[in-house]
A protein has these predicted regions:
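Catalytic P-loop NTPase motifs of RecA-like helicase/translocase cores
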Residues: 39-41, 72-73
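C-terminal lobe/lid and adjacent interdomain/linker elements of RecA-like ASCE P-loop ATPase modules
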Residues: 50-137
Length: 137
């Protein structure tokens, strides 16, 4: 029996969205993916990136992706200059900065340090935070 696409999980559908990237034939290309980890297990997202980097190794291809998956902040997967943070400012603008700015050792656990707030770009809640307050802005 053929499967019905509408019966598939969000993760399976997401994979169908991402797979064509591997068949990009252009020698020079820029690929943008918002929320690369959406509906995917962190290990699957990591494997996707590893395969992508292997396939495009001899091409002039650049991937720009956003994620909320801090497990991808790994210097065995990405170079320091490939990891960028976005931090919301008080005036609601965004500040973008590279991990390179922090001059970290290559053996450092970036994901743990990030979650501890070392690099900024994490949500900060005060003791009086109430969800309804977010809707009043």
């Amino acid at each position: 029996d053929m499967f019905d696409y509408t019966d598939e999980s969000d993760g399976t559908k997401r994979l169908f969205d991402l797979i064509p990237i591997f068949y990009e034939n252009g020698r020079e290309s820029l690929i943008l993916i918002d929320e690369i980890d959406r509906s995917l297990h962190t290990n699957l997202t990591r494997k996707f990136l590893e395969l992508f980097f292997e396939i495009v190794e001899d091409r002039e291809c650049q991937l720009v992706a956003t994620t909320h998956d801090s497990n991808l902040l790994d210097l065995e997967l990405l170079r320091q200059d490939e990891i960028w943070f976005v931090e919301r400012q008080v005036d609601h603008s965004s500040k973008v900065f590279s991990l390179n700015k922090f001059k970290e050792r290559f053996d450092k656990k970036i994901d743990k340090e990030y979650l501890l707030g070392r690099y900024g770009a994490i949500p900060i809640f005060d003791d009086d935070f109430v969800l309804e307050d977010a809707y009043e802005e």
